[in-house]
Amino acid sequence: MAFLEVSVQCQERSQARYEEVLESFGALAVTLLDADADTVRERGVFEPGVGETVLWDVVVLSALFPVETDALGLLAGLEGAEPGLDWGGVRFRVVVDEDWERVWMDQFQAMRFGERTFIVPWNQAVPVEASGMDAAVVRLDPGLAFGSGTHPTTGLCLRWLDRLGGDGVLGGGDVLDFGCGSGILALAALKLGAVYAVGVDNDPQALLASRENALRNRVAERLEVYLPAEAPVRRYPVVVANILASTLVALAERLAGYVAPGGRLALSGILRGEEEEVLRCYAVWLDVLGCEEEDGWIRIDGVRRC
């Protein structure tokens, strides 16, 4: 299916007015983009506060219209719709809708983390290098949930779990994956020796993806998933939390409380520059063993004090 895409650049303060006009002319969807993307001025917007909408200083609005829309007629209408809005830089182009799931699966390839952990798309063969070794192979279809192994925060956690598995820390114990997404970390822990895993996420779609991936990996009877309010109150020898730094800070007492005395905790999803605040919040409970960084993202790991 094809669409007519209309793109216009504006200041953040006038974004809502442009969006309202585009929608009034029948826009099927409006996407907001950073006008400085892929430049040195690019600025990440990760997590707004409650009731807050955070945008870039200069925004590109990209609106989709039916492909048969008369572009010149639409432009004339936009220019006369509301005084003060500048449509001089508007751009039109025809875009073709793609099977994005197929495109993504074509790009998602098997990956290795650490010594023996492999994340393999569910529809691909296990890599040759995984044969002949005690590989921990996780078959994965993330669906709509976060966690395919391609993001640095996930990779940092997978390498940590791989190391724990190699050191025998996971053997015979339980693991909590807080912010489980697709279930990738919980499943990796099970494949690396954990007996049982619990996944917690505030997104019901993530819980569904975790269950489906557990079935795909034949460990469904060893994984339970919960919304945060329903998660059992207990302690675990190993806890991993791959969420945002602000959430790690807000939930510090709760997350530390999940870790058994002498247990291991990994905190990920931390941008460079945010680690000091996270370390400060966990200092009362955690003896830090180390930090690892990849592409500006940091993982902190430590041991819960007795």
UniProtKB/Swiss-Prot annotation:
Subcellular localization: Cytoplasm
GO molecular function: protein-lysine N-methyltransferase activity
GO CC aspect terms: cytosol
Catalyses which reaction(s): L-lysyl-[protein] + 3 S-adenosyl-L-methionine = N(6),N(6),N(6)-trimethyl-L-lysyl-[protein] + 3 S-adenosyl-L-homocysteine + 3 H(+)
Superkingdom to which the source organism belongs: Bacteria
Family: Belongs to the methyltransferase superfamily. PrmA family.
Protein's organism: Xylella fastidiosa (strain Temecula1 / ATCC 700964)
One of the protein's GO biological processes: methylation
Bridged cysteine pairs (disulfide): none
Main location: cytoplasm
Protein's name according to its UniProt entry: Ribosomal protein L11 methyltransferase
